């Protein structure tokens, strides 16, 4: 449930193609070596800075030197205007924090939280895509529950649980989706260790009636 970048690199080489990785969701895990790094194999790597990196809303583009002129031309002036120096300072501060032992412990706890809840779902007849998780995300296939991802998203929002609908193999419509995506960095920031609060509420049936 991690990426085989070496295999992707071989496929790209066989087709004379660039290999690009968008690690927006997993960049915090990559930064702390809790997930494989794409940098050895990819020509271009992009990421947001506000997800698992826990910084301000921004983005980063890494690329091989021979692609500099093409990347620069694509970004400015077509996509980017003047820089926001306050955001740049915020990103720099967060990147420094991501090198700390405290941030590494935070990422490890995020993964532990996700695995704890994955175990709970598996024990209660929920079908997880890939059977579990090795990062901070859970993909729950809801086909055997008779509820769409969009409806579950709406219900969870009413009880202050943030998820989003997603598509899963076999879906006929991407508008509603039979899959729900859940991520756990925000829960940990709110001091939800091992998802204990969420699991206890789920066991009692609180907020689960739709």
Which residues make up each language-model segment?
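PLP-dependent enzyme catalytic core of the Aspartate aminotransferase-like
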Residues: 112-113, 174-210
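Conserved PLP-enzyme active-site core in the AAT-like
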Residues: 1-125, 146
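Residues at secondary-structure transition points
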Residues: 34, 65, 138, 189-192, ...
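Detector for Asparagine
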Residues: 13-16, 85-86, 113, 122-125, ...
């Amino acid at each position: 449930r991690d990426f085989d970048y070496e295999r992707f690199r071989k496929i790209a080489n066989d087709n004379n193609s660039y290999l690009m990785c968008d690690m927006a969701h997993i960049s915090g895990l990559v930064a702390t070596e809790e997930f494989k790094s794409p940098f050895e194999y990819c020509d271009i790597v992009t990421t947001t800075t506000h997800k698992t990196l826990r910084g301000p809303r921004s983005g980063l583009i890494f690329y091989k030197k021979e692609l500099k002129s093409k990347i620069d031309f694509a970004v400015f002036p077509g996509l980017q205007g003047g820089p926001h120096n306050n955001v740049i300072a915020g990103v720099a501060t967060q990147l420094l924090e991501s090198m700390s032992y405290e941030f590494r412990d935070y990422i490890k706890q995020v993964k532990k939280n996700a695995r704890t809840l994955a175990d709970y779902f598996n024990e209660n007849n929920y079908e997880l895509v890939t059977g579990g998780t090795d990062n901070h995300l859970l993909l729950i296939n809801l086909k055997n529950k008779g509820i769409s991802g969009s409806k579950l998203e709406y219900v969870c929002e009413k009880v202050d649980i943030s998820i989003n609908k997603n598509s899963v193999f076999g879906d006929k419509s991407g508008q509603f989706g039979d899959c729900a995506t859940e991520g756990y960095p925000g829960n940990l920031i709110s001091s939800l260790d091992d998802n204990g609060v969420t699991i206890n509420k789920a066991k009692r049936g609180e907020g689960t009636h739709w």
